[in-house]
């Protein structure tokens, strides 16, 4: 066994992991859009945001503290009261910090790579193929869970409908740039081509 493998095994043992790797799927049930303080309406489209960027909120939603690796998930809740289909492109969303630095979202697939269970390390703990398969199954559940909660790449907001999705940002340990940042969310009316931008300011420290 090489030094890296030994180190991984010792780490897993040290934090109390056993052969039974698992991922618990948590529900995500948004509140009525009026309940969110962080919201804005433009051209009959309302978008609210809730940063899930504390240990407690992240674990309650994703079963894992995503902030530990510097990720800040933000829940978007949307309501389209216009008569048109509205296009929201996830890659167009920007998080702008107090110094004007702009960050784009990261995909759940990139994030999952940092959190997935090390299948070989579980097997090396002495439980063989059964532990390997357990970790593999947990990784599949985690991938399905986090990707299903993620805002789709091109979200069509239908007239008189509500929808929601999570946008993930990688900000680094401690999420230093999240307080006093702003979310810029471009929208496009598909019938007219008219464009609007919703700006949501995340004031003060990340909400507890």
Role assignments for model-derived ranges:
Residues 1-10:
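Bacterial N-terminal signal peptides that target proteins for export
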Residues 9-18:
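Bacterial N-terminal signal peptides
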């Amino acid at each position: 066994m090489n030094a890296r493998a030994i180190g991984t095994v010792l780490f897993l043992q040290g934090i109390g992991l056993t052969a039974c790797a698992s991922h618990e799927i948590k529900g995500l049930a948004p509140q009525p859009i009026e309940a969110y303080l962080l919201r804005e309406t433009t051209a009959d489209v309302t978008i609210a945001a809730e940063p899930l960027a504390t240990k407690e909120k992240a674990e309650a939603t994703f079963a894992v503290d995503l902030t530990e690796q510097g990720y800040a998930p933000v829940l978007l809740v949307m309501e389209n009261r216009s008569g048109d289909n509205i296009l929201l492109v996830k890659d167009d969303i920007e998080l702008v910090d107090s110094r004007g630095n702009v960050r784009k979202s990261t995909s759940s697939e990139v994030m999952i790579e940092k959190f997935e269970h090390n299948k070989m390390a579980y097997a090396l703990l002495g439980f063989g193929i059964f532990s390997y398969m357990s970790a593999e199954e947990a990784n599949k559940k985690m991938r399905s869970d986090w990707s299903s909660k993620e805002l789709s790449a091109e979200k069509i907001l239908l007239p008189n409908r509500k929808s929601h999705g999570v946008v993930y940002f990688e900000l680094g340990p401690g999420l230093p740039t999240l307080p006093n940042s702003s979310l810029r969310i471009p929208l496009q009316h598909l019938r007219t081509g008219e464009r609007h931008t919703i700006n949501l300011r995340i004031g003060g420290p990340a909400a507890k």
